[in-house]
UniProtKB/Swiss-Prot annotation:
It is an enzyme of class 1 (oxidoreductase). Fe cation binds at residues 158, 160, 355. This is Alpha-ketoglutarate-dependent dioxygenase fc-dox. 2-oxoglutarate binds at residues 203, 367. Belongs to the TfdA dioxygenase family. Its cofactor is Fe(2+). Its EC number is 1.14.11.-. It comes from Phomopsis amygdali. Alpha-ketoglutarate-dependent dioxygenase; part of the 2 gene clusters that mediate the biosynthesis of fusicoccins, diterpene glucosides that display phytohormone-like activity and function as potent activators of plasma membrane H(+)-ATPases in plants by modifying 14-3-3 proteins and cause the plant disease constriction canker. Keywords: Dioxygenase, Iron, Metal-binding, Oxidoreductase.
Length: 399
């Protein structure tokens, strides 16, 4: 039998990071409609929740929960999904590099992790997931010896989704089945001297609402009235780029796919995302400075409704602009790293937190997770209207 609504216990997390809650007494395999409604509200209020003790959850019930949390999410085929990342129908580009494996009986719930996953993992046979990015990803290399002695980096602070054609997912599910063993020290490696002790195989998060609150009044005005144009097929654009050592942005080394090559890709201009810098939480009304800066092509900057925006389209200047706003949140006390235990399931509000993988060497053990999301059923809203991102008639979008 499923747990009743009265058994659904919310325990807010403690700590300076300022968000998150643990949930007890919920069985995803037998969750009721009433509990789904309450859970949807709770995720948006706390930005991230950890469902405790989900050891017996099936992938099919995991995927079903995502669909019940977002019942109006648009549907698309695996082939349509792949074409959101690259227009090549043969599957060239970022997706083969990531090596996503769909769990049988679901549409897009993925087996993710590292190492040998067993003879039969929910119908996937003899899967051995290799190291993909590991220590070689960064513009400032992480020395091989340090990496294998417990030094780690944040890989890339990001929002889930292709950031092209479909709206960003509201909710992501991330269920932990097996963790590696041991601890690591995340090193910012950017001259700040900052480090953070973490358990291996975990994921890092920060609140974009807390980031907004850290801005000055003048910066908040700019954030409220400005907007960003994301690159089309953005992950193809930065496929060859290397990451900054603290995970924010990518390094400006000229490794982006050249504009003329990107322009040659067949696409619908109306599928390119144009979004406010601030997303308003639909439950709390709180403001989130919510931008994935490494895939923004242009930013339109103003600090009031009657100002003509300044258009920044130099890639380095775009990234410098967002570094000024976002770097301040990347501090140990602002970052939650988790979850703690095998059997925990993270559900996070993709419109309210950004997250980053923390890689580890395979000798620390196998990591097994199930991760999935559905496209948003609408775009996020900012505090003020911006030029219509779906109708490309505005003079701002004429190159």
């Amino acid at each position: 039998m499923g747990s009743t609504a009265e058994d659904f216990v919310i325990k807010p997390m403690k700590g300076e990071h300022g968000f998150g809650a643990e949930i007890y007494g919920l069985d995803v395999n037998n969750i009721t409609d009433e509990q789904v409604d309450r859970l949807r509200d709770t995720i948006q209020r706390y930005l991230l929740v950890v469902l405790k003790h989900q050891h017996d959850e099936t992938p099919q019930k995991n995927w079903e929960l995502l669909n019940r949390l977002s019942p109006d999410a648009p549907k698309f085929t695996p082939e349509e999904w792949a074409l959101m990342y690259n227009p090549d129908p043969q599957g060239a580009g970022i997706l083969p590099k990531l090596g996503y494996l769909v769990l049988p009986g679901t549409e897009r719930l993925f087996l993710m992790g590292k190492g040998y996953q067993g003879e039969d993992h929910w119908g996937l046979k003899d899967i051995d997931i290799p190291e993909v990015f590991a220590d070689a990803y960064y513009s400032k290399p992480l020395p091989h010896e340090d990496y294998h002695n417990g030094v780690a980096r944040f890989q890339s602070w990001h929002i889930d989704g292709p950031s092209y054609k479909i709206d960003h997912p509201m909710f992501t599910s991330f269920r932990i089945i097996k963790f590696p063993e041991g601890e690591q020290t995340v090193d910012w490696a950017d001259g700040s001297g900052l480090t953070k002790k973490v358990k291996a195989g975990r994921t890092a998060f920060f609140s974009s609402a807390k980031l907004y609150d850290m801005l000055t009044k003048e910066e908040q005005a700019i954030a409220d009235y400005s907007w960003a144009e994301y690159m089309y097929f953005p992950y193809e654009w930065i496929l060859r780029c290397r990451g900054n050592p603290q995970g924010l942005l990518v390094a400006c080394e000229g490794r982006e796919v050249p504009d003329e090559q990107m322009d040659a890709m067949p696409r619908n201009p109306e599928d390119q995302l144009v979004l406010p810098l601030v997303w308003v939480n639909p439950v709390t009304g709180g403001k989130h400075f919510h931008v994935q800066p490494n895939i923004v092509r242009r930013v339109f900057v103003r600090s009031g409704p009657d100002e003509e925006p300044k258009i920044i389209d130099d890639v380095k200047e775009v990234r410098d602009f967002f570094t000024k706003f976002q770097y301040r949140i990347i501090r140990p006390e602002n970052i939650y790293v988790g979850p703690e235990e095998e059997g925990d399931q993270l559900l996070f509000f993709n419109w309210g937190v950004m997250h980053s993988k923390i890689d580890y060497p395979i000798e620390m053990g196998t990591r097994t997770t199930h991760q999935g999301w559905l496209a948003g059923d609408r775009p996020p809203k900012g505090p003020v209207p911006i030029p219509d991102p779906r109708a490309r008639s505005s003079i701002y979008y004429q190159k």
